[in-house]
């Protein structure tokens, strides 16, 4: 559940968890160093991200026609295309496909859209077991947690914590000491599930309208298992993932892998264009593609907010964010944490439910500097902050203006009057110098500040007075 109060509580808990802080510092430092190592040439980096931004912007500019082209070419290739306006519709589509084929177990590759849909929980409610096949996702599923990072879901855990968890919940006879041993434990469980699964579910990194091709980027091979071994493959994707041409994929793939994990290229890159053909010996008999909107069309209608949809889900903004790297992903209580989550979640949910996330930023701009597709994250954050209190314009965000507080508006109006009038300003300064330091910390206007910071002390003399006494001002 999203709320400002829960976010504050979870933030305090994270900041007071030394082990979590150490885990994130180690992981984030390593990711930043690896990314820097694969982008040694600043000029090449700027040229590549300019190209990536243009490719994504071009696709968004032509989004309606490209989606129609994607549907037509996928259908011609034998892929069954479905449209879902909401996560409820998307979940029902997956369930209908599963029930039609009497599916009892599902294996899932990495997919942020399926997390957005809360698909595992939904299928479980209808008696269908959904097992995560990505190692990081499997770890947090076994431990009944949510992902804390969009690329590395279990990054908040260290090796010892994962080993102990596997010992307690997966293989009581083994206490693994190395990453290889832990991987072997997971592989032993997952391999059996791959062969038993009735349906595989995957995400989509890029969908090529020109050819009707679905592209999946991965490192572990689980995505390939999920999309080839079960007789039915269901791919779920946000409508913004479409690209115009096959030639658009290589630049974005290069940006994605290097920005995400510091790799020149991932271990596996899957391109799916059709179900199994009659002359082929393996592959799914049916492939379904579910195109999810869930507020994306609303974002697309606004010139600035549309840039949110440029995202290729590399996670670089998170790795460099001074807020995320200190509190982790769970504090956000959202599918998408970090800088991209702060601008995406309020638009997917509503400003009333998630608008507070836009305030959790210092606006330092580190996320903007490392974004491979040049999303103006800080500009969008400021826009969302403004829209929380502005209900006078035609704003394409759910419940805009809902957080406007009358008392806050009155305070800012008074502040403006004081700072616009020299006499009132001097009177305010004089009064604060006399009584300001005696104000109790429990006052409503001070409490939020003093709960985490020292109360500011007011000087007895203003800077103007001191300068005049020193003869620095010629009256």
What are these regions (language model features)?
Residues 309-316:
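Conserved, hydrophobic alpha-helical core segments of structured domains
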Residues 136, 265-268, 396-398, 406, ...:
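Short coil/turn segments at secondary-structure boundaries
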Residues 279-308, 324-441:
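Ferredoxin-type iron-sulfur electron-transfer modules in oxidoreductases and energy-metabolism complexes
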Residues 4-31, 407-475:
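Intrinsic disorder at enzyme termini
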Residues 1-304:
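The feature marks the mature, well-folded catalytic cores of soluble enzymes
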Residues 80, 129, 317, 367, ...:
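Residue-level detector of anion-binding/catalytic polar loops
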Residues 71, 120, 247-250, 315, ...:
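Predominant activation on well-ordered alpha-helical scaffold segments within soluble catalytic domains
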């Amino acid at each position: 559940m999203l709320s400002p109060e829960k976010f504050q509580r979870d933030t305090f808990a994270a900041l007071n968890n030394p082990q979590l802080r150490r885990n994130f510092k180690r992981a984030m430092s390593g990711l930043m160093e690896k990314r820097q190592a694969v982008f040694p040439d600043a000029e090449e980096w700027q040229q590549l991200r300019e190209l990536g931004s243009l490719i994504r912007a071009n696709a968004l500019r032509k989004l309606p026609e490209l989606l129609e082209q994607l549907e037509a070419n996928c259908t011609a290739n034998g892929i069954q295309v479905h449209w879902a306006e909401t996560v409820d519709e998307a979940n029902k589509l997956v369930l209908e496909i599963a029930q039609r084929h009497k599916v009892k177990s599902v294996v899932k590759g990495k997919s942020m859209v399926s997390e957005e849909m809360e698909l595992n929980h939904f299928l479980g409610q209808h008696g269908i077991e959904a097992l995560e096949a990505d190692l990081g996702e499997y770890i947090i599923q076994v431990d009944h947690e949510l992902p804390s990072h969009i690329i590395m879901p279990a990054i908040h855990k260290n090796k010892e914590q994962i080993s102990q968890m596997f010992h307690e919940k997966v293989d009581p006879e083994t206490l693994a000491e190395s990453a290889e041993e832990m991987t072997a434990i997971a592989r032993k469980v997952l391999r059996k599930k791959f062969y038993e699964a009735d349906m595989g579910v995957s995400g989509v990194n890029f969908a090529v309208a020109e050819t009707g091709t679905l592209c999946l980027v991965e490192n572990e091979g689980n995505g390939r298992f999920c999309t080839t071994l079960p007789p039915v493959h269901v791919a779920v994707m946000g409508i913004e993932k479409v690209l115009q041409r096959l030639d658009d994929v290589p630049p974005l793939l290069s940006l994605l892998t290097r920005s995400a994990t510091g790799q020149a290229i991932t271990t596996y890159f899957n391109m799916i264009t059709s179900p199994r053909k009659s002359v082929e010996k393996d592959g799914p008999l049916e492939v379904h593609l579910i195109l999810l909107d869930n507020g994306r069309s609303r974002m697309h209608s606004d010139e600035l907010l549309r840039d949110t949809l440029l995202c290729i889900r590399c996670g670089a903004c998170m790795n460099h964010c001074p807020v995320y790297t200190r509190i982790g992903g769970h504090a956000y209580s959202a599918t998408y944490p970090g800088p991209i989550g702060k601008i995406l979640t309020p638009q997917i949910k509503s400003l009333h439910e998630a608008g507070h996330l836009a305030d959790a930023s210092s606006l330092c701009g580190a996320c903007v500097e490392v974004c491979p597709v040049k999303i103006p994250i800080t500009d969008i954050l400021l826009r969302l902050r403004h829209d929380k209190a502005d209900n006078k314009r035609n704003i394409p965000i759910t419940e805009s203006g809902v957080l406007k507080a009358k008392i806050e508006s009155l305070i800012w109006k008074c502040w403006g009057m004081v700072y616009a009038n020299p006499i009132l300003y001097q009177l305010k300064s004089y009064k604060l110098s006399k009584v300001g330091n005696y104000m109790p910390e429990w006052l409503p206007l001070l409490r939020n500040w003093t709960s985490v910071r020292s109360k500011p002390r007011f000087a007895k003399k203003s800077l103007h007075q001191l300068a005049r006494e020193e003869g620095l001002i010629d009256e």
